[in-house]
From Swiss-Prot, chain A:
Function recorded in the entry: Carrier of the growing fatty acid chain in fatty acid biosynthesis.
Boundaries of every Carrier domain copy: 2-77
UniProt GO molecular function: acyl binding; acyl carrier activity
Keyword Protease: no
Locations listed in the record: Cytoplasm
UniProt-recorded name of the protein: Acyl carrier protein AcpP
Keyword annotations of the record: Cytoplasm, Fatty acid biosynthesis, Fatty acid metabolism, Lipid biosynthesis, Lipid metabolism, Phosphopantetheine, Phosphoprotein
Domain of life: Bacteria
NCBIfam families assigned: acyl_carrier, PRK00982.1-2, PRK00982.1-3, PRK00982.1-4, PRK00982.1-5
Record gene name: acpP
Source organism per UniProt: Rhizobium meliloti (strain 1021) (Ensifer meliloti)
GO cellular component, one term: cytosol
Family: Belongs to the acyl carrier protein (ACP) family.
Length: 78, 423
């Protein structure tokens, strides 16, 4: 797993209080990890803070899984 | 439709003397004193450096461990006043043995929990975030974690209580108003059971600084915290801030009897009044307090001669004398048979939670026939025939108790509780 993926995973574990093994690349924040709509807003804020990127609202709406977040950040930092 | 009768069938408490009603009560009766110097944050530049903090610990031996009451990831989203309320509500519902599962029971059970100042510290931090990092860094939980009625909201969500969902904000009268208003909802048939009380987590720099700025706090006993809260004593100089939550389960009498619930006491009287005088000081003639107590007694169908114990508002400020004068006017010749104490001498002033915690102490005074003490009453500044229960608890017959709460803005609330004898 890439450095970005590891850091994303850690944020998800910390914020949602879920077990590490559940946080797979395809895991959906809402459907698989118990997040609600406010949790996802906070997760996006945490990604912005951690990686120094800006995630506009329309982009945030399409970040539904751990993998989506990793892909967006990799692209933003490329 | 006549007014239905309302009884207390459960209690829960997080107080500076302990996590749990019995832990707090037994320490209170034993003369425990929770005041200490604040060490959790910088107090050097504050005029008041002391407070009555709840006993943080691992949850054993009456200590409070927030993780026992809310998952850490959820705690992060709310102010501590909400966690205290969740803890006290869990305890109270368990104590009452009330766990509504049917549709009918869930919609018949409501919540009415208030707070005086809510998530003040979190609001300050949110302000810093907005100023220093901008609006995009403000958490989506900033608002729902600070709003006062979210204590009621969170409790209702956890326990699926779908009846009236309400809240009270009347400064230091909040807890008493919450219990009084919730009793009314049951009496009028809007609910059969109410989870009611007050919660407060005010011990932070802005609150200590703010209350000191309006000259409400004790500042002369910083080196001897246990001596600072001294209601009616000549050396009192302000209140000592406390924190915690008190929650009762209120229940319609027949509903409680039908399920064989334990009954602590009946809520027989409730009075409310306004001073219309000053933003922080009570009216000097004590008329607001007098009318409030009188209304509560009238509602109860009792007279002053029926009162055995009064849990005074008694904050350890100059206002103690005004309250005492109002009580003396109310009770007249019955003064010599009444015991009146201020439990704020032991736990400090819990602001919005005070009235609820003190109503529970009043119910326990009836249950156990014992008046808790007024600590530090070494040199009374007043002369009265009323027994102010100095230093040590007093065993005596208590069938009727009156609990007073008065708040900034001139808002007054009195509750009258009576022993329930099965009739």
């Amino acid at each position: 797993m890439s450095d970005i993926a590891e850091r994303v995973k850690k944020i998800v574990i910390d914020h949602l209080g879920v077990d590490a093994e559940k946080v797979s690349e395809g895991a959906s924040f809402i459907d698989d990890l118990g997040a609600d709509s406010l949790d996802t807003v906070e997760l996006v804020m945490a990604f912005e803070e951690e990686f120094g990127v800006e995630i506009p609202d329309d982009a945030a709406d399409s970040i539904l899984t751990v993998g989506d977040a990793v892909k967006f950040i990799e692209k933003a930092q490329a | 439709m006549g007014m239905r009768r309302v009884v207390i069938t459960g209690t829960g408490m997080v107080s500076p003397l302990g996590c749990g009603t019995e832990a707090s009560w037994s320490r209170l009766i034993a003369g425990g004193n929770a005041a200490r110097r604040v060490t959790e944050f910088e107090v050097e530049d504050l005029p008041a450096k002391i407070a009555c903090r709840i006993p943080f610990g691992d949850g054993s031996d009456g200590t409070y461990n927030a993780d026992d009451w809310m998952e850490p990831k959820e705690q992060r989203k709310v102010d501590p006043f909400i966690v205290y309320a969740m803890a006290a509500a869990d305890m109270a519902l368990a104590d009452a043995g009330w766990k509504p599962e049917s549709d009918e029971d869930q919609v018949a059970t409501g919540v009415l929990i208030g707070s005086g100042i809510g998530g003040l510290e979190g609001i300050v931090e949110g302000g810093y975030t907005l100023r220093d990092k901008g609006p995009r860094r403000l958490s989506p939980f900033f608002i729902p974690g600070r709003l006062i009625n979210l204590a009621s909201g969170q409790v209702s969500i956890r326990h699926k209580l779908r009846g009236p969902n309400h809240s009270v904000v009347t400064a230091c009268s909040t807890g008493a108003h919450a219990i009084g208003d919730a009793s009314r909802l049951i009496a009028l048939g809007d609910a059969d059971v109410m989870v009611a009380g007050g919660t407060e987590s005010p011990i932070c720099r802005i609150s200590l600084a703010g209350f000191a700025a309006c000259k409400a706090l004790s500042t002369q006993h910083n080196d001897n915290p246990e001596k600072a809260s001294r209601p009616y004593d000549a050396d009192r100089d302000g209140f000592v801030m406390g924190e915690g939550a008190g929650i009762v389960i209120l229940e319609e009498l027949e509903h409680a009897k039908a399920r064989g619930a334990k009954i602590y006491a009946e809520v027989v009287g409730y009075g409310l009044s306004g001073d219309a005088f000053h933003i922080t000081a009570p009216s000097e003639d004590g008329d607001g307090a007098y009318r409030c107590m009188q209304m509560a007694l009238k509602r109860a169908g009792l007279t002053a001669a029926d009162i055995d114990y009064i849990n005074a508002h008694g904050t350890s400020t100059m206002a103690d004398t005004i309250e005492l004068g109002a009580v003396e006017r109310l009770v007249g010749d019955s003064a010599s048979k009444i015991s009146m104490s201020s439990t704020k001498s032991a736990i400090g002033h819990l602001l919005g939670a005070a009235g609820a915690v003190e109503a529970i102490f009043s119910a326990l005074a009836i249950r156990d026939n014992i008046a808790p003490p007024t600590l530090n009453l070494d040199n009374p500044s007043v002369e009265t025939k009323i027994d102010l229960v100095p230093h040590v608890a007093r065993e005596r017959e208590i069938n009727v108790a009156l609990s007073n709460s008065f708040g900034f803005g001139g808002t007054n609330a009195s509750l009258v509780l009576r022993r329930y004898n099965g009739d």
